Swiss-Prot record:
Superkingdom of this protein's organism: Bacteria
Gene: minC
GO biological process, one term: cell morphogenesis
Protein name: Probable septum site-determining protein MinC
Ranges of biased composition (kind: Basic and acidic residues): 75-93
Function of the molecule: Cell division inhibitor that blocks the formation of polar Z ring septums. Rapidly oscillates between the poles of the cell to destabilize FtsZ filaments that have formed before they mature into polar Z rings. Prevents FtsZ polymerization.
UniProt organism field: Helicobacter pylori (strain ATCC 700392 / 26695)
Length: 195
């Protein structure tokens, strides 16, 4: 008997664009895109394929119409032409989760997120704001905010400000149950332990 697994996949569909715009998007967002399938609605150029392979991103070239729920986004060209918003005026809100986040659960948010329960293995958290986990963290965390606060870490799947933490960088997080605050200063990762 053939062994198969069924999976639900989140995907980005990219319409025909200038290769430079697509490469810029991929370079800027490759850490986030690790968790998605990228579907190109055209035959992509070799330089775009090189960037996809460099970052080990999953992609598909097809002209076939795919069914699924669509989330409305701005076209890539318009998105890259907009000036960056002034974050001091539009501070993200904070969402607090008092429950455990179970395996298979995915949370995508523009808010700051606080988790009082555990993040189980197989759960995925992606936030544009700061993330604080005061329970056991076994799942994947992708944080684009100014800081990441973790207590008891049992996962090596952590991305902070577009940087995938290496096993060497994750090791200091695994040693005890003290609260650790992760920040970045000029691309240098800073981990402080709070007793």
């Amino acid at each position: 008997m053939l062994k198969t697994n069924q999976k639900n996949v989140h995907a980005f569909e990219i319409e025909k664009q200038e290769p430079e715009a697509v490469i810029g998007f991929l370079e800027k967002n490759h850490a986030l895109l690790q968790y998605f399938l990228i579907i190109f609605k055209y035959d992509i150029e070799s330089e775009v394929k090189a960037v996809l392979r460099k970052h080990q991103l999953l992609f598909l070239e097809t002209n076939r119409v795919l069914n699924g729920r669509h989330i409305k986004t701005m076209p890539l060209k318009d998105e890259t032409d907009h000036p960056k918003p002034n974050h001091s005026k539009t501070e993200p809100k904070t969402t607090i989760y008092e429950r455990h986040i179970r395996s298979g659960e995915e949370i995508y948010s523009t808010n700051h997120l606080i988790f009082l329960g555990n993040i189980h293995n197989g759960a995925k958290i992606i936030s544009e704001g700061c993330v604080s986990v005061y329970g056991v963290c076994e799942g994947a965390i992708v944080c684009f905010g100014e800081c990441l606060i973790l207590k008891e870490v049992k996962s090596a799947q952590i991305v902070f400000q577009n940087k995938i933490l290496s096993l060497k960088e994750v090791e200091p997080l695994l040693v005890n149950k003290n609260i650790k605050i992760i920040t970045k200063n000029d691309d240098i990762l800073d981990i402080k332990e709070v007793l």
